[in-house]
């Protein structure tokens, strides 16, 4: 019993000592979970995470550089905004690189089932990263956000590949201009 009391007293003293330096804010559940997710990241060699503010783990960028498939040689940047409802609510993920892709629209919205109806709190940032990487390896024309790209992929894979290459080099597809995104 005395040991328990001394542990409580020690903790109280540590908290009050920390309180004199400035008000210490308790980490939210979302912050604790994102810290755990980041610590347990197992990034593939084609991905890298960038934090503009190392004290803010709730906002970061993911860079994917596919090394195979239609998008090989491209560099695609995604922004992650993790809300206070995480892990019960999925993070908001946007593609900042304009890309000709059936599952990413021209505004950067991403069609990935685990970011919507199939989200579960047991999923992690790592799950999302692998899901995004898979979209570049296997674009899904069955669930498109960019219907025009999906139709071309379904009807003429060669033309789709040419359009992807043209867009990544920097050029027009129809009336839409794509900035160069090759590494």
Swiss-Prot record:
Residues forming the catalytic site: 111 (glycyl thioester intermediate)
UniProt-listed Gene3D superfamilies: Ubiquitin Conjugating Enzyme
Catalytic reaction equation(s): [E1 NEDD8-activating enzyme]-S-[NEDD8 protein]-yl-L-cysteine + [E2 NEDD8-conjugating enzyme]-L-cysteine = [E1 NEDD8-activating enzyme]-L-cysteine + [E2 NEDD8-conjugating enzyme]-S-[NEDD8-protein]-yl-L-cysteine
Function: Accepts the ubiquitin-like protein NEDD8 from the UBA3-NAE1 E1 complex and catalyzes its covalent attachment to other proteins. The specific interaction with the E3 ubiquitin ligase rbx1, but not rbx2, suggests that the rbx1-ube2m complex neddylates specific target proteins, such as cul1, cul2, cul3 and cul4. Involved in cell proliferation.
Name listed for the protein in its UniProt record: NEDD8-conjugating enzyme Ubc12
Membrane-spanning ranges: none
PANTHER family (UniProt xref): UBIQUITIN-CONJUGATING ENZYME E2 (PTHR24067)
Entry PTM: The acetylation of Met-1 increases affinity for DCUN1D1 by about 2 orders of magnitude and is crucial for NEDD8 transfer to cullins.
Domain remarks: Both the N-terminal docking peptide and the catalytic core domain must bind the uba3-nae1 complex simultaneously for optimal transfer of nedd8.
Keywords of the record: Acetylation, ATP-binding, Nucleotide-binding, Transferase, Ubl conjugation pathway
N-acetylmethionine modifications at: 1
Top-rank EC class of the record's enzyme: transferase
One GO BP: protein modification process
SUPFAM superfamilies: UBC-like (SSF54495)
Disordered: annotated segments: 1-28
Pathway as given in its UniProt record: Protein modification; protein neddylation
Domain UBC core as annotated: residue spans: 29-173
Name of a matching Pfam family: UQ_con
Enzyme Commission number(s) from the entry: 2.3.2.34
Family affiliation: Belongs to the ubiquitin-conjugating enzyme family. UBC12 subfamily.
GO molecular function: ATP binding; NEDD8 conjugating enzyme activity; NEDD8 transferase activity; ubiquitin-protein transferase activity
Signal peptide range in chain numbering: none
